[in-house]
Amino acid sequence: MPELPEVETSRRGIEPYLVGATILHAVVRNGRLRWPVSEEIYRLSDQPVLSVQRRAKYLLLELPEGWIIIHLGMSGSLRILPEELPPEKHDHVDLVMSNGKVLRYTDPRRFGAWLWTKELEGHNVLAHLGPEPLSDDFNGEYLHQKCAKKKTAIKPWLMDNKLVVGVGNIYASESLFAAGIHPDRLASSLSLAECELLARVIKAVLLRSIEQGGTTLKDFLQSDGKPGYFAQELQVYGRKGEPCRVCGTPIVATKHAQRATFYCRQCQK
């Protein structure tokens, strides 16, 4: 599933082609996504794009009459293409732009979303989200306070959007490795110093992934059709049985609630 770096990479890739241009119309080939494509999107006409923003894993297209909320789901990607390029099997939504380009949404598993809202504030998919991990609001003191009474393992807690947004399975595993913290540690057992280190590491890992265009493991593509290159720098995720790049110990993989966790027994305590 695309996580924060992949969504931010998409935002940065599409923004120059959308802001200042006008959506002439939308083409919805298959509106049966995770939630049905909002009726307002079918009727879009002559709408200038004012901004392209991101909140958590949601892309937000600001128009004069409201907002398009896009979620990439499990396998979605957005590409900027020439308008004349014919769609392929899993190309479900196009925004046809005044500059001769089309924003094309591809989603083989159809678990993404295209929603419309007049006002962002209070929308149900955005209403209960925690702070952005790259913001000043997310820091060691905040993390320690939120972990203090939490009787759950630190990894699933990091992936809870009420704590912090956008830190999914890949980046939770990578950040915990970089901080030397075992993923099964109780959140409440982390010291303030460990929380400060973990908060710094999460920011660094996410920023590095954004620099590399995100992580492509299967479906994700950048807006220019290229894969994300952070997969080449993964330390533990997807490396079961391979030697740890630090100590040589084989990487361990476990599964809880259908999610795989990767870690090094030697480096993470």
From Swiss-Prot:
Start-end of FPG-type zinc fingers: 235-269
GO molecular function: 8-oxo-7,8-dihydroguanine DNA N-glycosylase activity; class I DNA-(apurinic or apyrimidinic site) endonuclease activity; damaged DNA binding; zinc ion binding
Gene Ontology biological process: base-excision repair
Documented EC number(s): 3.2.2.23, 4.2.99.18
Entry keywords, A to Z: DNA damage, DNA repair, DNA-binding, Glycosidase, Hydrolase, Lyase, Metal-binding, Multifunctional enzyme, Zinc, Zinc-finger
Cofactor annotation: Zn(2+)
A Pfam family recorded for this sequence: H2TH
List of residues binding DNA: 90, 109, 150
Family: Belongs to the FPG family.
Subunit organization: Monomer.
Function description: Involved in base excision repair of DNA damaged by oxidation or by mutagenic agents. Acts as a DNA glycosylase that recognizes and removes damaged bases. Has a preference for oxidized purines, such as 7,8-dihydro-8-oxoguanine (8-oxoG). Has AP (apurinic/apyrimidinic) lyase activity and introduces nicks in the DNA strand. Cleaves the DNA backbone by beta-delta elimination to generate a single-strand break at the site of the removed base with both 3'- and 5'-phosphates.
Protein name: Formamidopyrimidine-DNA glycosylase
Organism name: Escherichia coli O7:K1 (strain IAI39 / ExPEC)
Designated gene of the protein: mutM
